[in-house]
Amino acid sequence: MGFLKGKKFLIIGISSVRSIAFGIAKSLYNQKAELGFVCQNEKIRKKIKKLVEPMKSCIVLCCDVSNDKNIKKLFIDLGQVWKKFDGLVHAIAYCPKQYFNGDFIDNITREGFNISHEISSYSFIGLVKACRTMLNNFSSLLTLSYLGSQRVVPNYNVMGLAKASLEASVRYMASSLGKENIRVNAISSSPIKTISSYKITNFNKIRNCSYASSFLKNSVTSENIGNVASFLLSDLSLGITGSVIYVDNGFNVSSMNNIQ
C-alpha cells in the first residue's frame, strides 16, 4: 500500500512529460495519491488530459494565475469534485526570454521584474490564500525553487530575485499556517532539462558546471525530485515546514569540487 493512499493533491503547472511537475505527479500516483491537475489555458488542456490519463484523474482544470478572479473560479470548480484536499504542488514560474541573457542591470525593467515576481512568487501565495478553507488538517504545500535564489547564476538574472521571494514566502506562509497544522516547503533542484530551461542562455553550460561540481556523479531526474516531493507531502515529514530542501547531488554546499 502506498504511503499517500487516501490523500488528494492538486498539481499546478504541469506542461509536458519533461516537466518536473510530471515527475512529481508520477511519484505521487505510485504512492496511491489521488491527483488533480491545473494547466495554464484551454489551448493545452487537451494535451494535458492525454498526458495524465495513465494517472486516472478526472480533474484537469485551467487557471490564469495572474488573475485573482481566475484563481477564485479554479477552486469553485474544484469544489464541485473535491470538497477538501490534502495539499498542492506549485510548479509555476515565468519570465520573458529576453531577461535570461546578458548583464542583470542592463537588461532588467520594471515590467520584467513585476511579471517574474507575480507569476513565479505571488501566484503561490494567491493560490494558497484562495484554497485555505479547503485544506484538510495536516495538509502539505510544496513549491519549486533553484539555487539562483541564493547565488549568482549567469543569465538567471531577475528570476533569481523571484525565486528568493518565493523562498521567503515559504517561510512566512509556514508561520501563518502552522496553527492550522498545514506545512509549507520548497524543493531546490539541480538544473533539469525542461521546455522552460532552454530560455536561459547557455543553460547546458550551467547544467554541466553543476554536474562537475556536485558530489554525486549522476544526473538528478524529475523522478528523483518526485520522490522527495512525495515524502514532503506525506505524513512521514510532519516535522518539516518552512524549509528549502535541496535535491542537487550536493552542489549547493560544494566549492571547486571538480579540481583534481
Curated annotation (Swiss-Prot):
Task: Enumerate the residues binding NAD(+).
Answer: G13, S19, I20, Q40, D64, V65, I92, K163, I192, K193, T194, I195, S196
Q: Does the keyword Oxidoreductase apply?
A: yes
Give site residues, Involved in acyl-ACP binding.
N204, K205
Enzyme Commission identifier(s): 1.3.1.9
Query: Which catalysed reactions does the entry list for this protein?
Result: a 2,3-saturated acyl-[ACP] + NAD(+) = a (2E)-enoyl-[ACP] + NADH + H(+)
Q: Name one GO biological process term.
A: fatty acid elongation
Question: Residues in the active site?
Answer: Y146, Y156
Please name the top-level EC class of this enzyme: oxidoreductase
The UniProt keyword set, sorted, is:
Biotin biosynthesis, Fatty acid biosynthesis, Fatty acid metabolism, Lipid biosynthesis, Lipid metabolism, NAD, Oxidoreductase
Which InterPro entries does this one have?
Enoyl-ACP_Rdtase_NADH, NAD(P)-bd_dom_sf, SDR_fam
Q: Annotated pathway, please?
A: Lipid metabolism; fatty acid biosynthesis; Cofactor biosynthesis; biotin biosynthesis
> What does the function comment of this entry state?
Catalyzes the reduction of a carbon-carbon double bond in an enoyl moiety that is covalently linked to an acyl carrier protein (ACP). Involved in the elongation cycle of fatty acid which are used in the lipid metabolism and in the biotin biosynthesis.
How does this chain assemble? Homotetramer.
Q: What is this protein identified as?
A: Enoyl-[acyl-carrier-protein] reductase [NADH] FabI
Species of the source: Buchnera aphidicola subsp. Acyrthosiphon pisum (strain APS)
